[in-house]
Design a protein with these regions (language model features):
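Conserved, well-structured functional cores that handle cations and Mg-NTP chemistry
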Residues: 1-157, 162-177
Length: 177
């Protein structure tokens, strides 16, 4: 759902990385792969090579600005990325911060209820029939539960106002102790 090229551009700042982006972009654009399997592999890598007891889990939402109406979950809503109401998709993301760096280790696309109820539109956007409406805090809880189940240790959890203000999210954290 998210453009690999845009993802690479956001983390690759030096001009010399353009060639690396093109090398990776071509085969990835044609390849069929399961994003959840890639996430699981990444989380396993974090557990084996990067995890620290003092790690920090960071949960936030981010906006992906869009021009059209066909992308999954797109609509006019507030985007922190733009700082105003824009046509965009919203993703809930979980990053892991450790002493040597950080990694984005999980994500879910927020699908507004109208998108979940309109199966024709959902089918056109290739949204699986198994998807159902979930609030952004519910998605954050899902990300946190998957991360804990993967065995990624963390001493701290930081969350944006939406997730951090959710009593079910805070109770999930309290019950982990």
């Amino acid at each position: 759902v998210l453009s690999l090229h845009k993802a690479f551009l956001s983390v690759c700042e030096a001009p010399r990385t353009h060639l690396a982006i093109q090398i990776v972009k071509k085969p990835c654009g044609r390849a069929k792969w399961d994003a959840d399997e890639v996430r699981d592999d990444l989380q396993q890598y974090v557990v084996e090579f990067l995890a620290e007891q003092d790690g920090v889990l960071i949960i936030d939402e981010t906006g992906f600005l869009k021009k059209g109406t066909k992308s999954a979950g797109v609509g006019r809503r507030y985007s922190g990325t733009a700082g105003r109401i824009e046509n965009c998709q919203i993703g809930v993301v979980l990053a892991y911060r450790f002493s040597k760096g950080h990694a984005l280790i999980d994500r879910e696309l927020y699908l507004p209820q109208a998108w979940c109820e309109d199966r024709t539109r959902g089918c056109e956007a290739r949204i699986p029939d198994t998807n159902s409406f979930a609030t952004k805090p519910a998605l954050a809880r899902e990300l946190l539960q998957r991360t804990v189940a993967a065995g990624i240790p963390a001493r701290w959890v930081a969350a944006d106002e939406v997730s951090g203000g959710d009593s079910k999210f805070r109770n999930l954290l309290k019950n982990r102790d």
